Amino acid sequence: SVRDELTKADDGRQWRQLLVLDGNGETAAWTGDKNRTETTHLAERDLVLGGNMLAHANVPNVMRDRFHTLTQTSQRFELCLLDALVAGFEAGGDVRGTTSAMIKVVYPNALPLDLRVDDHPYPMTELQRLYDMTRDPEYRSFFDRLPTPDKPHQY
């Protein structure tokens, strides 16, 4: 498996956490036993979640439940991801506190959405603000005119 290939040659694998989701929805996960408690991962079709130093082992389950609830609605995929991150944060998240957050979504024939917040006192609020900016009509007008793999000459 891809998980085995990526971890077998890594002498530090016991300290690593690996979460993989491919373009077909297949998932793989690894949590080395030297990661700090509470550690866990959850891998199912189209979704993989994990963490270490979590407030409790249920954090990924809370995130999964929020994600599945929202994907049953007409919410945009990236908004489902953002709301799942917020749910994990609200469920206790990382015991050290949360200072960063990111979302990256790659579409086959469109530009990726790549939002990242580093070292911020309110990373979830800031990530939401960045996402909201991408939905602004003026921004969308610009973004929608950028070249994409299927429309490399648009402007």
Language-model segment annotations:
Residues 1-155:
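N-terminal nucleophile
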